Amino acid sequence: MFEYPQGYKLIAGVDEVGRGPLVGAVVTAAVILDPHNPIEGLADSKKLSEKKRLALAEEIKEKARAWALGRAEADEIDEINILQASLLAMTRAVKSLKIQPHFVLIDGNKIPKDLAIPAQAVVKGDSLVAEISAASILAKVARDQEMEELDKQYPEYAFAQHKGYPTKLHLEKLAELGALPQHRRSFAPVKKALEQF
């Protein structure tokens, strides 16, 4: 059981999706839930079916007091590394909220330095904290939709299937077709593909 910090009225949960993929942005979400408007079935986005995630994402957007997305693009990831880019994207999500929270709960073990709001990192927060679960669902749905859009542009890479993660199929496509502008140049398999072409 997670114990919420005491004395804070508006608490935001923050999570990121897309640290592991070789392509595209790392996407984050920040969510302030409404205690008078509970959402059933919130869980870590990775443990939910796509259908369930999509339904919950709509419900979160409808019922949350505030929600926002943040992102760091592939070129930013290459410039400052994936961890720093994830933290930057988290800060962007929090700053984009229409209501500023009094406290922020962040999935993982790191807190962005420039948040300027009291915060706590929660390991396995996406399973323990409803606000972080909600954020993980919004971020995952948003990023998956981006991969589906990329798939329409470059169907030969099968992005809708692997969502940019370094699966056997994605690595085969990289070796065969080379890297796209959206690929993260600092990631080893992409570097290798760039050297071959």
From Swiss-Prot:
It catalyses: Endonucleolytic cleavage to 5'-phosphomonoester. It is found in: Cytoplasm. A divalent metal cation binds at residues 15-16, 107. One of its GO terms (biological process) is DNA replication, removal of RNA primer. It comes from the Bacteria. Residues 9-197 form the RNase H type-2 domain. SUPFAM superfamilies: Ribonuclease H-like. Manganese or magnesium. Binds 1 divalent metal ion per monomer in the absence of substrate. May bind a second metal ion after substrate binding. Belongs to the RNase HII family. Endonuclease that specifically degrades the RNA of RNA-DNA hybrids. This is Ribonuclease HII.
